[in-house]
Regions:
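N-terminal, positively charged/glycine-rich alpha-helical extensions of SAM-dependent methyltransferases
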Residues: 1-15
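Conserved alpha-helix/loop element of class I SAM-dependent methyltransferases that forms part
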Residues: 24-43, 58
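Short alpha-helical
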Residues: 28, 54, 75-76, 121-124
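Class I SAM-dependent methyltransferase SAM/SAH-binding core
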Residues: 46-103
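A short acidic, Gly/Pro-enriched loop at the edge of an enzyme's catalytic core
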Residues: 102-113
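A short SAM/SAH-binding and catalytic strip from SAM-dependent methyltransferases
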Residues: 113-126
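A short glycine-rich, Lys/Arg-flanked "PGG" loop and its adjoining helix->strand segment in the class I
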Residues: 127-135
Length: 135
């Protein structure tokens, strides 16, 4: 798998390196965007394409009594996101699910906010995925 192919769905050792690079490299734009996201202290947030979980960690800080759930289809990304957010997972404030944004398993109208950082260009069918997120 080429370096750039590993950005779409990180796998193996190269994927682990890629996820670490994404957590770091996407940080400036994510921090900028999160400044504009107003959340209540007990907000319920979904992060689509959560990658290595760095933005989930930031979201958990913005809503310290809330719940943040993440979805990603890369096993490597899910493992990293779970590791990075282990404390919040143990507290019942965080869930990381492996799956596709095309088919979100969570209940309709459950979330107060949905985020997707540096990921929509990987979504297979944008209109379908956005309809799924909107529900």
């Amino acid at each position: 798998m080429s370096f750039f192919e590993n950005t779409r769905k990180p796998v193996g050792l190269g994927g682990k390196i890629m996820v670490a690079m994404m957590n770091l490299g996407h940080s400036p734009v994510a921090r900028w965007g999160l400044r504009f996201l107003e959340l209540t202290l007990d907000a319920k947030v979904l992060d689509c394409g959560c990658g290595g979980g760095a933005n989930m960690k930031r979201l958990l800080k913005k809503c310290p009594r809330g719940i943040v759930k993440g979805i990603d289809y890369s096993t490597v990304s899910v493992e990293k996101a779970r590791s990075l957010n282990q404390t919040a997972i143990q507290e019942g404030r965080c869930v990381v699910w492996q799956g596709s944004v095309e088919r979100i398993i969570f209940a309709k109208d459950w979330f107060d906010a949905v985020t997707a950082f540096e990921t929509v260009y990987f979504w297979p069918d944008l209109p379908r995925c956005f309809r799924e997120v909107y529900r």
